[in-house]
Amino acid sequence: MTVIKRNGSEVTFDITKIIAAITKANESVDESIRMTPMQIQRIAESVEFSCLKMNRSPSVEEIQDLVEYQIMAHGAFEVAKNYVTYRYTRSLVRRSNTTDEKILSLIECCNEEAKQENANKNPVVNSTQRDYMAGEVSRDITERILLPQEIVEAHREGIIHFHDADYYAQHMHNCDLVNLEDMLQNGTVITGTLIERPHSFATACNIATQIVAQVASNQYGGQSISLTHLAPFVEVSRQKIRKIVEAEMASIGADPGAEKITELVEARLREEIRRGVQTIQYQVVTLLTTNGQAPFITVFMYLGEAENEREKKDLAMIIEEMLLQRYQGVKNEDGVWVTPAFPKLIYVLEEDNITEDAPYWYLTELAAKCTARRMVPDYISEKKMRELKGDVYTCMGCRSFLTPDRFTDAGIGNIANAKNYQPGKHKYYGRFNQGVVTINLPDVALSSGGNLDKFWKIFEERLELCHKALQCRHNRLKGTPSDAAPILWQYGALARLKKGETIDKLLFNGYSTISLGYAGLYECVKYMTGKSHTDPAATPFALSIMQKKNDKCAEWKKAENIDYSLYGTSLESTTYKFAKCLQRRFGIIEGITDKGYITNSYHVNVTEEINAFEKLRFEAQFQHLSPGGAISYVEVPDMQNNIPAVLEVMKFIYNNIIYAELNTKSDYCQVCGWDGEIQIVEDNGKLIWKCPKCGNTDQDKMNVARRTCGYIGTQFWNQGRTQEIRDRVLHL
């Protein structure tokens, strides 16, 4: 068994340290009231037993809490008092020097929490370490100076989660839809250099990747671009290539005829599209931003965005090439094709591609093959999204969705000064999310003790606490000058404001959103009703919880003219933190707090047996009540030899739910070449990854790709998320 120290490093559990600490406190009291060595030994053994029952690595603080409890349980109150006093004195010393130990542990690569905090960041490399070091300083300033203490304490206790505190010291927003069309068609500026409208598709792709990197370096969340914004440059290249081919034919005195020339032009055009798409794929996974990671980028593929049939056909060629290259994958350092984490791909299911007789059905078949092998694309239903939101648009990065455009309907106009603004047309590209605060629903339930009246009272209080935290997020952005991130606010990615102008007008009237997140609906309902929220007897209670959160968002929105929106939090590493906090506050409760994770958002619990179609049908009603963002998934086996089944799931998505994905496995052992599933096994109380063929357990010598929270993770996960991945049951 191992222990997580305060600086995040991991050490072997040592019972003698507990005995020594209790003995020291014991010796500080009068001899007449001291405990015997046998009592101290029993306390230490009891603490060790409690830690083993956690099925995870306990923190030093948790161990000390257990020691305090056991000393008092033995009636040694004076000893307990001295033990508490010693802890408090030590905490004061640590508080006076809040970041040094954590930063040093990051530099020396012994911080286990940092190693597993983000499934797409490698904390060993210098660039990532610099980001983490800056994050520690930001988090420290945030907790000591910038945030109200009640929010800091609620965050520490896992009552709420104040997302991305490591970026809060700066005036940065979360995620967005990049207005790539405006930047490519009307020019932009990158690091002081004017970038004019590109004269070929390949150049447009190259500029797009530079924009993506610049945007990622000026925010902390994900971003999305649309292939539709690249499609007009296919025709630009077509005309350019035609002139070159005609000149070549003339130079040699050849006249192959218009049909042959067109064939040659289209062949060269296809090659340019291949190179352009390859530029996007390889630039995205090899670029490093100031965040110490590849850009968290989503590529949107929606035929319905095309302006005309010619552009739609050109867009289809780009989508086809994007899918073909993702199906192939990228090579790892051993030259083996593996699954990359980025870009995330989203493919829209629509009338033109959802049936066998549709003109673009071939793209849907290719998408199905790609999903079966590489876990992307994910799918948005044009039909369901238009029904529920009125428009069809992509999420910002992983799952965060904008609210439907209300500022255009209100006649507010082009507040971002975009050069591609069309009066009366709803606007989505160029909009963004201000930030997220998540409520821990199981904590609300457990705090109520199962009393329904008490539950709703506590729920109301916690929601208002989240509201206060979200107002802090909003106010941190108010007054931000456009100069803070010129690529975003001055040169078209989000707006074209004047130098020195603040971004304030973009924070109101629904131009941007701010998200109330939630997690653990399953555990919350299970504790309050004794049943899963899939049980018809418990579903109405689950839906009433969802409706209450939406009602609060509507109330805040009306009062402040800010688009608060309910968001199904993705909880990448926070699932482990919430689980540990619940165990510390309420103990181990079977089916509620007995794991190292809590269930994401509204999802069916990962251990619950349910088929793919029933899961999607059930979760659709909750996705409708998460307008600020949510995604559903089904866990499937290797489907590469059963593409018709994948297509059936996709058709079901089209008819039943806005946004969903299929999860499979994509692994490779660099020691023996095994390309089946790398397994999760327990070793000395810790979950590790192990090749079933050769027994390799070295994470540096294997490629493992798993769906983490909408994105694909490839850098491994903390113990809580790893346990959740292990516990997932198949739905097909």
Predicted features along the sequence, with ranges:
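Charged, amphipathic alpha-helical regulatory modules used
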Residues: M1-C110, R726-H731
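Conformational switch/transducer regions in large eukaryotic molecular machines and scaffolds
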Residues: D14, V681, K686, T708-Y711
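Amphipathic, well-packed alpha-helical segments that form the structural scaffold of globular domains
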Residues: T23, H467, Q471, Y522-K526
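Conserved catalytic cores of very large enzyme subunits
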Residues: T89-G510, K531, D535-T697, N703
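Metallocofactor- and cofactor-centric catalytic cores in central/energy metabolism, strongly enriched
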Residues: I273-V277, Q281, K526-Y527, R721-D727
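Contiguous, well-ordered alpha-helical segments that form the cores/surfaces of helical PPI scaffolds
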Residues: M301, I514-Y527, Q547, R707
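Long insertion/accessory domains within large nucleic-acid-processing enzymes
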Residues: G695-L732
